[in-house]
Amino acid sequence: MSLNFLEFEKPIAELEAKIEALRDVSRHGGDSAIDLDKEIEQLEKKSLELKKKIFSDLGAWETAQLARHPQRPYTLDYVKHVFEEFDELAGDRAYADDKAIVAGIARLEGRPVMIIGHQKGRETREKVKRNFGMPKPEGYRKALRLMKMAERFQMPIITFIDTAGAYPGVGAEERGQSEAIATNLKEMAGLTVPVICNVVGEGGSGGALAIGVGDYVNMLQYSTYSVISPEGCASILWRDSDKAPQAAEAMGLVASRLKELELIDEIIEEPLGGAHRNHVQMAANMKATLLRQLAELEQFPQDVLLERRYQRLMNYGYC
């Protein structure tokens, strides 16, 4: 899969294009290939140093672009690389099955867990099928149905958050979008099993919060979490969506800032260049975090688990 480079990555893209061109010559150049090995090695070293330099000083706007990268791993990618024996479950038993939310039972190192997450889709047909990762009320009701199932069978719940927001269409509002989100917030706060939430891309407003109440809330290094998109914020405050970079900086939507505010618990490191550059390494980092946090949470008696979660929520808003 060829990588899509973002605007701020152009110097890296140019270097990697040169490296690939030299590799191509090396593969088909006969004896002259020997002379190219050293040059390729030097360029690879230069590319690595450039990546480290660029990614050591990313602004909020660059991070927001990375969070939306079309090749970033989605929920089903984590299902593939982190879990075993995944069985997808469908439908809210009231209206329909929303494909923007994927959910099901799987095993994590042999342990049964319930997985729930947003799914955006990559190709045009799949994006439409998944509604670009923007769930409707039936998606959140499906999620709640399966959370309750997990509670009955004492299975930990793991959620993957990656949405621009809940779908704002007329039909979704008529079917009770706000009620579905509010009900999930209330019910998740009282679940008697461990709940670990992971923001893996965009954490957009109530659409993210609806599967984001848990004992641990983690964010990937280059993910975002906010009440509105930078473009939306800029359109409201400055009547100009081109001011999105300024809005992103002002909103404090990046993982490091949210960790300072104690709105999230842990930042999961991404491979150099972002999660999209190495799905397998990103999944390994995710798996290690989940195993460690689950081992800790499973030691707590039920009443302690609920009290811990309650105190965590009550601390929101205090500096």
UniProtKB/Swiss-Prot annotation:
GO terms for cellular component: acetyl-CoA carboxylase complex. Belongs to the AccA family. It comes from Vibrio vulnificus (strain YJ016). Pathway: Lipid metabolism; malonyl-CoA biosynthesis; malonyl-CoA from acetyl-CoA: step 1/1. Acetyl-CoA carboxylase is a heterohexamer composed of biotin carboxyl carrier protein (AccB), biotin carboxylase (AccC) and two subunits each of ACCase subunit alpha (AccA) and ACCase subunit beta (AccD). Residues 35-296 form the CoA carboxyltransferase C-terminal domain. The keyword Ribonucleoprotein does not apply. Signal peptide: none annotated. Its EC number is 2.1.3.15. The lineage of its organism: Bacteria, Pseudomonadati, Pseudomonadota, Gammaproteobacteria, Vibrionales. Disulfide bonds: none annotated. It catalyses: N(6)-carboxybiotinyl-L-lysyl-[protein] + acetyl-CoA = N(6)-biotinyl-L-lysyl-[protein] + malonyl-CoA. It comes from the Bacteria. This is Acetyl-coenzyme A carboxylase carboxyl transferase subunit alpha. GO terms for biological process: fatty acid biosynthetic process; malonyl-CoA biosynthetic process.
